[in-house]
Amino acid sequence: MSELVLVVEDDPANAVLVDAILSSVGGFEVVCSDDGDEILNVIQERPVVAVLMDVSLGSTRLGGEKVDGVALTRRIRDLPEGINLPVILLTAHAMKGDRERLLFESSANDYVAKPIIDQKGLVELVRRHIKAAEAVRAELGARDTP
């Protein structure tokens, strides 16, 4: 079974593009959604290895309220399953200072500017963060063992 990556994107064309890159180039199983409640449920119910999160999310709702990708990422971090889950922001916000501000505000792991041009680079970035998260989990597990 393939590793599961969630794509949180409210623009259908962008969702299809990121899904195609991750599934065909990366070999991942991909679930795309713009429903915040669904995203949190999937993270709690299935072994998700990474989340790619659009920052703007004009139509995304969580508990009936409109949220952006920064707020939804913070909610993911509140879940036990989300503490060490790699979250990579996808955004057209590419002005000087946007990267640092968005990473700080959201507690995401990384940032990719749209449009996505380097497909292999995106897959490599996702894999790098998955590997780092696995190393952290292994280290934490080793500390818990007497």
Regions inferred by a protein language model and the residue ranges of each:
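The C-terminal output helix
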Residues: 126-146
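Conserved phosphotransfer cores of two-component systems
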Residues: 44-46, 75-85, 105-106
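Acidic, metal-coordinating helix/loop segments flanking the phosphotransfer/catalytic sites
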Residues: 32-60
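Two-component/phosphorelay signaling modules centered on CheY-like receiver
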Residues: 12-37
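Conserved acidic carboxylate
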Residues: 9
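Alpha4 helix (beta4-alpha4-beta5 surface) of REC/receiver domains from two-component response regulators
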Residues: 63-67, 71, 83, 94-112, ...
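Short, conserved "switch-loop" micro-motifs in signal-transduction and mechanochemical regulators
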Residues: 56, 93-95, 117
